[in-house]
Amino acid sequence: MDNGVQEGSVRLGEDAEAVLAGAVSTKANHRQVLSSLLSGALAGALAKTAVAPLDRTKIIFQVSSKRFSAKEAFRLLYFTYLNEGFLSLWRGNSATMVRVIPYAAIQFSAHEEYKRILGHYYGFRGEALPPWPRLLAGALAGTTAASLTYPLDLVRARMAVTPKEMYSNIFHVFIRISREEGLKTLYFGFTPTVLGVIPYAGLSFFTYESLKSLHREYSGRPQPYPFERMVFGACAGLIGQSASYPLDVVRRRMQTAGVTGHQHGSILSTLRSIVREEGAVRGLYKGLSMNWLKGPIAVGISFTTFDLMQILLRQLQS
């Protein structure tokens, strides 16, 4: 009788410990998700604000048939400043923030979760993932974020390429597009976006995580210095954006067709139109040199801010 009671007590104690451990683990996971969301939101906001004037200039060239050059790009920046004022260089940045903050928060948080899930699946729990799962985690994170925030990206592109008299604010863009072009217009360009995000996010996260792993292996230091993170992020941005750039041009043409005089069309028809009118290299890689300037800066700031915020929040929690 006593033995039965003792065994029952032991089992009850073990069950209680298991429930308590599960609750602690769940709480830690929730805290990690919130930490990733906050860090990602701040990282995206800082990075995009830093390069907003260059981003707006790139979009204007992407959606027009004007030939791109660095000289013409900076001339456009200068005349925009003269004619519309300094803050006009950030026109559309409020729409960018509305999109980028949730996009970056979701992307970074999803990346951490996909790393955890894939690490568990492939038996690398708590360790650096091997190359293929590392690439897959980045691609899945980017696809998840793009799918959930795409209409905001279209609104940002519309505000960037139109005069301020056309749309007074973000909500005005949504209302006019819905009334004049239909709700489905909010998803024009979605397919090339996802097709571009897969190599972009996959290669960006893969490159950054790989460089950090190599740094750990050869330097003997567990964490890179902030400027080293910036360099790793810059390399990641350069590789990721170069690989996905033609689809970015196609996406912008499809998003802004209703206000630039181009016809709405499929990916292939838009692609053929660009190549026919402007040539393959000149049309599909228009503004790439601008991206080589702004992309590494933005991605470097983004990845570095995320990592440093994660470190800071872990220290505060402990």
Curated annotation (Swiss-Prot):
It catalyses: ADP(out) + CoA(in) = ADP(in) + CoA(out); 3'-dephospho-CoA(in) + ADP(out) = 3'-dephospho-CoA(out) + ADP(in); adenosine 3',5'-bisphosphate(in) + ADP(out) = adenosine 3',5'-bisphosphate(out) + ADP(in); AMP(in) + ADP(out) = AMP(out) + ADP(in). GO terms for molecular function: ADP phosphatase activity; ADP transmembrane transporter activity; AMP transmembrane transporter activity; ATP transmembrane transporter activity; coenzyme A transmembrane transporter activity. One of its GO terms (cellular component) is mitochondrion. It is a multi-pass membrane protein. GO terms for biological process: ADP transport; AMP transport; ATP transport; coenzyme A transmembrane transport. Its main location: mitochondrion. Pfam families: Mito_carr. SUPFAM superfamilies: Mitochondrial carrier. Solcar repeats lie at residues 31-117, 129-214, 224-312. It is found in: Mitochondrion inner membrane. The chain crosses the membrane at residues 33-53, 89-109, 135-155, 186-206, 230-250, 293-313. Widely expressed. Highly expressed in adipose, followed by hypothalamus and brain coronal sections containing corpus callosum, fornix, thalamus, hypothalamus, optic chiasm, pons, midbrain, and cerebellum. Keywords: Membrane, Mitochondrion, Mitochondrion inner membrane, Repeat, Transmembrane, Transmembrane helix, Transport. Belongs to the mitochondrial carrier (TC 2.A.29) family. Mitochondrial carrier mediating the transport of coenzyme A (CoA) in mitochondria in exchange for intramitochondrial (deoxy)adenine nucleotides and adenosine 3',5'-diphosphate. This is Mitochondrial coenzyme A transporter SLC25A42. The gene is Slc25a42.
